[in-house]
């Protein structure tokens, strides 16, 4: 962000899906908020949540930073004299959640002199090798010399998201000696596809599961780590040794720095 933009009463609105798990929020969205306030002290930095369920669940009184809806923050920033608005839509990929945010911002363009909306980290414009390099460092931290398989566990897939992941996975596999699989909780290939392939292979494996989710919170705990019905539970029942990384991607400084590098 240039000094010229700063003098034009700029504002940065961070929008995340949010988590009702306050610790998960503190580890990602609240860090975005604090770090951007420090990086751009002349800008009005605000944050909002896009998920109605999160807003219903979260205790606003206990939150570390202000908890607001997107309309609330747009009205506030307009009232505070922001003319040039930059929206950091903090999403990993172009999912429904991302386009919901875009749909809420677009009608408000006339309220500001300029409005920019960030793309998700995984998109068709940026070099897939860049995000593969960042993820490779994270996988190296999660795996060890005994790891037989690294499973990247994402939440939701559609045709566009699956295509965007392909060159990233190709690069990751070139750089990693351990086989890597990407699966989705909602989408294909899913948990059952992984279990079927492992059954066909017919041997017990030492598996490391790394969540491809920005927040650690509810989905990680329930879908990947719960004692019953989770990916970890199903793999263990099939005879495999399983380690699940406890971090959401947004907890890694390199991921947050990639957001900043690409968008400011």
Where in this protein do the model-derived segments appear?
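Active-site-proximal alpha-helix that buttresses catalytic centers in soluble enzyme cores
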Residues: 1-264
């Amino acid at each position: 962000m240039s000094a010229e933009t700063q003098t034009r009463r700029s504002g940065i609105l961070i929008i995340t899906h949010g988590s009702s798990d306050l610790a998960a929020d503190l580890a990602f969205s609240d860090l975005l908020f604090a770090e951007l306030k420090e990086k751009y002290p002349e800008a009005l930095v605000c944050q909002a949540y896009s998920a109605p369920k999160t807003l219903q669940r979260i205790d606003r009184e206990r939150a570390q930073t202000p908890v607001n809806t997107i309309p609330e923050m747009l009205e506030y920033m307009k009232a505070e004299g922001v003319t040039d608005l930059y929206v950091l839509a903090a999403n990993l990929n172009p999912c429904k959640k991302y386009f919901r945010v875009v749909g809420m911002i677009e009608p408000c363009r006339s309220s500001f002199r300029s409005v920019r909306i960030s793309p998700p980290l995984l998109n068709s414009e940026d070099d897939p090798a860049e995000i593969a390099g960042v993820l490779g460092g994270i996988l190296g931290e999660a795996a060890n010399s005994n790891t037989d398989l690294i499973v990247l566990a994402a939440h939701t897939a559609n045709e566009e998201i699956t295509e965007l992941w392909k060159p990233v996975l190709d690069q990751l596999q070139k750089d990693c000696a351990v086989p890597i699989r990407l699966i989705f909780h909602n989408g294909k290939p899913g948990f059952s596809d992984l279990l079927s392939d492992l059954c066909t292979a017919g041997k017990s494996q030492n598996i490391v599961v790394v969540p491809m989710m920005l927040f650690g919170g509810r989905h990680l705990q329930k879908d990947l780590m719960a004692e019953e019905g989770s990916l970890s539970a199903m793999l263990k029942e099939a005879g495999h040794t399983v380690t699940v990384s406890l971090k959401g991607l947004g907890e890694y400084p390199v991921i947050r720095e990639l957001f900043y590098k690409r968008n400011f």
